[in-house]
């Protein structure tokens, strides 16, 4: 009996017969040995070949398996190689290999212009291998010169967005005239629109060069780490100098944080000091004014007990003027005084005629003694007294005696006159 004869579970045609829920199995034949080896059960979708000799069937099966394995390995290797060679979305921009040499060749030009010109030149060279390299270099040079003329008067380092649309190189529906002129000067023949990338826009701004290809891909070419960005360095210097100090012989006042309070404190510390002698003089003057006010109250209350409210208001204003405190600079203020007596007149402003500059009638004033010495002069009289009470005033009616800093007043006026004055 041949070792390749069919068994109970195999039909003569080589097809697999399944019984019940038993899994399908394949018998792999080893041509070197006579017994048949059966591997562990596994599912398989491989259908045996049409009826043939056992050796041919086994050979075909081995060939198919080897072919499938070889094809799968070759397809996987080809797919991996194709995936590694296919361009990624971020590899559209060609590398700027000689950018450092170009920057050194144009030290007086802005690096933004050099980077932009190098990118367009290398893109043109990569897409058109038949263009000589010398023409590509000339194209780059002419483009740098053209960009230099374009940004003249439209370059604002403090406002990079200003003039952005004017400086941009646009190849959308039409090709930018800047590129076409540079190609013409570089002896690059042919339709230039077919030589460069379309649907590309490049923005050349102070401190930044970015291009967009299509609608979704965008890449920044400048700044980059290999070259120092002098604009960022300039901005760092400005940030370090933001704190400005004003220095004098005594101290330093920073004005970048809370300058108003510091300057105010500095001025207060220098101006609020009063010499001891001057402050003592102010205290003595205030004491003298207080004593005079007490004397004034005693005498005037006895003299004008029945006077009108006008004379009382005049007296209150007089007390305010005598008790008015001097300022830091020891100068008397010539403004209206506020009546601050305890008679319910708080916050009341005096009349302009009763201000500190107006002459005030007071018994302690030198003007009062001058009136007594020249009592026969009818031109001077107390301003608040009624005119009919002063009609018969003479030197015999009023006598003033001073002794031990006390003033006494004797009046010969009868009470009938007082009653007559207020009848």
Swiss-Prot record:
Family matches, as InterPro entries: Anti_prolifrtn, BTG, BTG-like_sf
GO biological process assignments: cell fate commitment
Entry GO terms, CC: cytoplasm; nucleus
UniProt biased composition (Low complexity): 43-54, 257-272, 284-297, 341-351, 369-379
Domain of life: Eukaryota
Pfam family, one: BTG
SUPFAM superfamilies tied to this protein: BTG domain-like
Region Disordered, annotated ranges: 1-54, 69-96, 257-297, 341-398
Biased composition (Polar residues): 19-28, 273-283, 352-367
Family, similarity comment: Belongs to the BTG family.
Protein name, entry field: BTG family protein
Gene behind this protein: btg
